[in-house]
Amino acid sequence: MNKSNRIQTAELDWESIDGIEVPISKQFGDVYFSKDNGLLETRHVFLNGNDLSERLANLQDFEYFSVGETGFGTGLNILALWQLWQQVRPNNHSHLHAISVEKFPLSKADLIRALNVWDELRPLSKQLIEQYPFPLAGCHRLSFPEERFSIDLWLGDAQDIFPSMVKTKAVNAWFLDGFAPSCNPDMWEQNVLNNIVRLSDYGTTFASFSVAGILKRGLKAHGVDITRPRGFGHKREMLKAVWKAPVSEEILLEPVRDTFQFTQQRIAVIGAGIAGLSTAWAFAQRGHQVTLFERTVPLSGASGNPLALLNPKLCPIEQSHEHLMTLSWQHALNFYKNFQAFRPIQIQQMALKNAQDLLDLADQYPADIVTQQTSSLESDYPHILLTEAGAVSPHQLRDEILQHPGIELKIANITTLISFENKVQLKSGNETTLEADHVVVCCARESAALFENYPLLKPIRGQVSWVDNSFATLPLNEAYSYGGYCMQLNTSELILGASFYPNRDDQEVLLDDHVHNFELIHSVFPHYAKQLPPVEQWQGRASVRAQSPDYFPLVGKMQNESRISTFAGLGSKGFLFAPLCSEVLVAQILGEACPVPKSLLQKLDAQRFQKKVKPKKPYFKSQ
């Protein structure tokens, strides 16, 4: 993505026509939807133009259908698609996914105003607005599991975004929208159309209000068969097309990795920390049968602290489209909001070193999510405020996830994986415990016991402390980050963390670590720290994090054709990374759209250190 291409929200004029407010783009000098009836035009051009009523109504059980769009705009096309899905979707586990790109997203206030026109869409508009993303570049996944519907909204320039998309699943239908070619020629350039076709397959359909020569030539160059039926209203023609040509050699250079069959899958997840819990949840939400194995009790490792803080480290704004921590930030917030275990908070990030660099970095972000504000605690250090953050109660989250009817917890020590062509056998000692279609190993450093040449994960000891502070409590919706962190664990206790000792795996609670945590807070908030009880009265928990050599988690299959995957090495950011990374993992296994760009997927690749990681003998067999 071009460094100059920071996300700017759309600049709008508004025109009132027959009592209806129509937004007009100042950047492109064109309307966002028809002045006659934008919703009827969407149905005529995009829904009927792709024959979606019939196609969606006939989806098989567990079938995954994706629709791509070249300009999100007000979201009207996607909302009309969602409404149609509600009307015709079969009573099974099929899923509809939309992929849309937008260079100039509307502000949330403008989006609310634009969609207020459509009374019949209001229930859907409300749900969309609740998850509408920050104006930060990259992919933002909006999930509506009860609707069996999801949206990947990619913010940025289409010329950069479409080449960056991973083709794990071919797009079934396209809405070629995004202002007229005369107003927005960049959207219709050959590079964009080449990548739209790259992301498609035999039988993919296309529809557009435009029949401009640049569009027709671009599609015909790839063998797309075009017709021009009557357009909407006063428009004489529209474009309707289907790709009937054989797949070209260029397209075959990036094969679809979808080997998924439209049946319920039996999934085994080994390890019940946050990686395993989020993975189990992602599969179960799609209707698959999940068995979650844990050797002792869930959250017995580093995920089992009393509280988890969602505290992203900001990156330069031009890197946000491929920065794991930034992309995980809003995804995690949207994920945890579904649970009672989540507490929305604000985080004061203190600038202990290079203060001006942090302040300059904050200025690159939208002021409604990153700003500067006076701290509730007295300190000599400057700071920034993250207005959108959160804290999670891990044990409450565990209990909520394990209540899912599609997840079964089993206490067992899985010692052997035997992989066959169409299944994986799990053994505990000499006893076969389960046969599964896919296995995901989420055991942190212990994952290596099930593989040969598993990447080395560094142990990092960490201890959190908590102490009575009923005499001087902090606001429940505030946290402070300063190399360590502190916030209210509950209404009468303060939690502080965390010590950080690489290459140590001891887990005894130590007074020295309490002292370390005290010294961290005292160095930044000395007046407050002096009020805390002596460290001898503090309680704590020590655990060992697992960190990969390059600080990125291991996410994906251990061999290209294997039914065995891993998800491990999350370090100290497990609760931040897990929701997004589990979606990446599920996309690879089930053949769904990938919510991160190619560049980031390569950094997460579980095979990146050794491309030939093999299960220990005799774990891998063919039959």
From Swiss-Prot:
GO molecular function, one term: flavin adenine dinucleotide binding
Keyword field contains Magnesium: no
Region span, FAD-dependent cmnm(5)s(2)U34 oxidoreductase: 270-623
Matching SUPFAM superfamilies: FAD-linked reductases, C-terminal domain, Nucleotide-binding domain
Cofactor: FAD
Keywords of the record: Cytoplasm, FAD, Flavoprotein, Methyltransferase, Multifunctional enzyme, Oxidoreductase, S-adenosyl-L-methionine, Transferase, tRNA processing
Known EC number: 2.1.1.61, 1.5.-.-
Positions of the UniProt region annotated as tRNA (mnm(5)s(2)U34)-methyltransferase: 1-244
Catalyses which reaction(s): 5-aminomethyl-2-thiouridine(34) in tRNA + S-adenosyl-L-methionine = 5-methylaminomethyl-2-thiouridine(34) in tRNA + S-adenosyl-L-homocysteine + H(+)
GO CC annotation, single: cytoplasm
UniProt keyword Transferase present: yes
Highest taxon of source: Bacteria
Any one GO biological process: tRNA wobble base modification
Cystine pairs: none
Name of the protein this chain belongs to: tRNA 5-methylaminomethyl-2-thiouridine biosynthesis bifunctional protein MnmC
Organism: Acinetobacter baumannii (strain ACICU)
Gene that encodes the chain: mnmC
